[in-house]
């Protein structure tokens, strides 16, 4: 059993023991397993009637998730001290609980320089414009070949274990959003090599107001004890009036949903689950597919939106598509998945233009087909 597994198990095992440890570590005691409550109540009243309370505010701003010991020394004799042994230096997570596996990711983000032991992609994909901001999808892509596999003693199973963390911080450095996932995998040992040819992809939607932020991401290989982390500027523009257009992304695959549709996840259109292909490399073995969403302006209901997709190579237009748009779905969006009309390897730029009435929206992205 791994350390983080033990921590998670401890959250639910023997709650009375946990209460006792909490009480004693904070200078109190637990009343339990007794019908005689006179003595413990007398002790409580003595403590309430005659005591001094001291508070301690740490001066260090280094929130490294480590345990910091506290020691209280008295100049007078005959006094009894009730105090906790110390505290964990945890940052404010925007009101969200801190999970055991996230502590190691926070330590990676606190390192200088940031660790780079793993190759991964982490992108916040922009989707629906909303009043004051926009909806996004945070996507991680980690090649399975980056992870260390532990084979059991009988060589029957292989264990791989990755953890992901993304923090969104405002200009004051305060955490306003957290996205994380712990993904252990146990697979048959004879299928390991094929499994390592794929990628571990994790995506989660989130909403954010317009502004300038810092996006911090970390990925952990729990079996090897290695990590990688990045920090970047993240700017959210206020929504423009008129028809809207999401970011454009390459599609790794589209799978039929085997669970109820999640209307708040823009990567689940019309009963499918879109797995993005992050980075700028698309395999030439098959024509690449693009995915984006159009958001019609309800005030222009008489005019239907129209989309034009242009492909450029070395500044010259080499292909153009004008797909017919279906009606908007229940969320008011028009998801578009389009097979690019490209065959020759090379570097391409894609430009998407959406028009509805007098309003227009534009988007672009570039990739290598090789």
Model-identified regions with their sequence ranges:
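Scaffold/interface architecture of coatomer-like assemblies
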Residues: 1-370
């Amino acid at each position: 059993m791994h350390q983080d597994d033990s921590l998670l198990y401890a959250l639910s095992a023997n709650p009375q023991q946990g209460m006792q440890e909490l009480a004693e570590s904070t200078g109190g005691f637990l009343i339990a397993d007794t019908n005689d409550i006179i003595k413990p109540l007398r002790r409580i009243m003595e403590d309430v009637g005659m005591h001094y309370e001291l508070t301690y505010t740490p001066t260090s701003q280094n929130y490294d998730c480590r345990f910091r010991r506290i020691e209280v020394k008295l100049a007078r004799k005959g006094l009894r001290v009730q105090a906790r042994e110390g505290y964990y230096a945890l940052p404010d997570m925007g009101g969200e609980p801190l999970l055991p596996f996230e502590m190691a990711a926070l330590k990676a983000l606190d390192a200088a320089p940031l660790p780079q032991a793993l190759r991964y992609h982490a992108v916040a994909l922009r989707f629906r414009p909303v009043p004051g901001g926009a909806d996004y999808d945070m996507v991680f892509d980690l090649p399975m070949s980056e992870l260390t596999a532990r084979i059991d003693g009988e060589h029957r199973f292989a264990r791989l274990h990755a953890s992901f963390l993304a923090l969104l911080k405002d200009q004051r450095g305060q955490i306003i959003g957290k996205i994380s996932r712990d993904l252990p995998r146990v697979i048959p040992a004879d299928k390991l090599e094929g499994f390592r040819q794929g990628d571990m992809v994790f995506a989660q939607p989130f909403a954010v107001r317009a502004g300038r932020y810092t996006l911090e991401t970390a990925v952990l290989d729990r079996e090897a004890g290695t990590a990688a982390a990045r920090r970047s500027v993240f700017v959210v523009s206020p929504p423009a009036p008129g028809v809207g257009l999401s970011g454009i992304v390459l599609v790794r695959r589209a799978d039929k949903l085997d669970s109820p549709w999640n209307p708040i996840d823009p990567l689940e259109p019309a009963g499918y689950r879109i797995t993005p292909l992050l980075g700028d490399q698309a395999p030439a073995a098959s024509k690449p597919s693009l995915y984006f969403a159009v958001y019609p302006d309800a005030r222009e209901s008489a005019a239907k939106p129209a989309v034009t997709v242009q492909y450029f190579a070395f500044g010259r237009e080499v292909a153009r598509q004008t797909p017919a748009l279906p009606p908007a779905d229940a969320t008011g969006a028009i998801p578009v998945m389009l097979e690019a009309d490209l065959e020759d390897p090379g570097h391409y730029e894609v430009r998407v233009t959406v028009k509805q009435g007098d309003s227009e929206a534009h988007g672009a992205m570039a990739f290598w087909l090789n």
